[in-house]
A protein has these predicted regions:
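Subset of outer-membrane beta-barrel
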Residues: 23-401
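Bacterial Sec-dependent N-terminal signal peptides
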Residues: 1-25, 235
Length: 401
């Protein structure tokens, strides 16, 4: 079965860009990989224009992905948003991400929310081992999640989310079948108002543990793959300059909670090494929950590292992002951001730019990615989001009466 294109796409999605090993043989290229990597793609244009930050930014309709606990602090009674991203357009032309999110407030202290994510990898020509055409496959992935958030005190809220994940490789082979998995998120958010001479500023602190899930399999559970469990921690500070102008400064750190797969070259004897076989067996039999904790210390089991080098490798797995958002009269928005990943863990480094316009009930946002790595496939990525606010719709109806 020829699935070369599918493998190339999956390889790119986890950020695998070629890096020369001659620079430092100890600091070898060792990215953390997982199944269904589309779950880690930033879905909306607002956060996408601020360097992919969102754990502690001011609540919006697309908070479901970044931190659903923020919904308990949102002011409008309900809202819905639709986002679209043409993905990896520098590589292929038919990969797309669509994202639908919405929420509804129950009183002043709690909210329910949901999102639907659909990721299409386009069409792939399938052949058998002899190159005979076997039709066309259309790999796709989607997830559906619902969340409940509640304010537990004046300035603190929490949320839990449940998620169903589907991943179909589009392979016409009786040995392969679509993968299914279930996951959960746990999120916390604190929004603390601080009075200034120019108005009330807002300090936000957020934490989201996402995709705490079962493993996924495409071959009737003979092989099981971790999904990208993730920890995102962020801080945000929104400063009003006067009644019309405001600037928010945002910073996130992000760590995927999956251990790195053992590499045979780090073991004496390579693939024939008993130690390598034992390390592979440990990885493959590990539960998803155990893997979350092990992901903070897996480098210490790498025989190629000293303890200091193992510690540095763990630090390299922490990505960071920062972003700014300027708003005028809560109607016009300008955004800028930067996201950084170690060159040994994927080398995804990029600037982002964004703009938004809000008119009573509607808001349109656009985000753009400018890649910095020479061969990054993320360069020139565009995101679009269109949001509808229920309170704004009510205001429009009232004006028409």
């Amino acid at each position: 079965m020829n699935i070369k294109k599918l493998l190339i796409i999956s390889f790119i999605l986890v950020g695998c860009v070629a890096v020369s090993m001659a620079e430092n043989p100890k600091n070898f290229y060792n990215p953390v990989t997982s199944g269904v990597p589309s779950l880690t793609i930033s879905p909306d244009a607002r956060a996408g224009g601020m360097g992919d930050v969102g754990a502690a930014t001011e609540p919006d309709i697309n908070s479901q992905y970044w931190n659903p606990a923020k919904y308990a602090n949102i002011k409008s009674v309900a809202g819905v948003s639709l986002s679209y991203t043409p993905w990896l357009r520098k590589i292929v032309k038919d990969i797309d991400l669509a994202y639908l999110a919405g929420y509804y407030k129950i009183g002043d202290l709690q909210a329910v929310s949901m999102s639907l994510r659909y990721f299409s990898l386009g069409s792939i020509a399938l052949t058998d081992n002899e190159g005979t055409p076997m039709g066309t496959g259309k790999p796709n992935e989607f997830s559906l999640d619902v969340a409940y958030s509640r304010q537990l005190s004046k300035y603190f809220s929490m949320a839990v989310a449940m998620r169903y994940i589907y991943s179909g490789l589009g392979i016409k082979d009786e040995n392969y079948s679509p993968g299914h998995a279930f996951g959960a998120d746990i999120a916390m958010y604190s929004g603390i108002p601080i009075s200034l001479n120019t108005g009330v500023s807002m300090l936000g602190i957020g934490l989201n543990l996402s995709n705490i899930s079962t493993k996924i399999s495409y071959d009737k559970r003979n092989t099981e793959i971790f999904l990208p469990a993730n920890m995102r921690l962020g801080v945000s500070y929104a400063i009003p300059f006067d009644a019309y102008n405001k600037l928010s400064i945002n910073f996130d750190i992000n760590k995927i909670l999956v251990p790195a797969y053992p590499q045979s070259k780090n073991y004496e004897g390579g693939v024939t090494s008993e130690e390598y076989d034992a390390a592979k067996g440990k990885y493959e039999k590990m539960s998803s929950i155990a893997a979350i904790f092990y992901s903070f210390a897996d480098a210490y089991d790498n025989p190629a590292y000293t303890r200091k080098e193992a510690f540095m490798d763990e630090l390299r797995e922490v990505n960071w992002s920062t972003g700014l958002e300027y708003s005028y009269n809560n109607q016009f928005f300008g955004r800028f951001g930067y996201s950084n990943e170690s060159k040994w863990k994927g080398n995804r480094k990029f600037f982002t730019f964004g703009a938004g316009f809000k008119l009573t009930a509607f808001q349109l946002d656009v985000g753009y990615v400018l890649g910095l790595a020479p061969t990054t496939p993320l360069d020139q990525t565009l995101r679009f989001s269109l949001s509808f606010d229920v309170d704004g719709l009510k205001d429009l109806v009232d004006l028409g009466k």
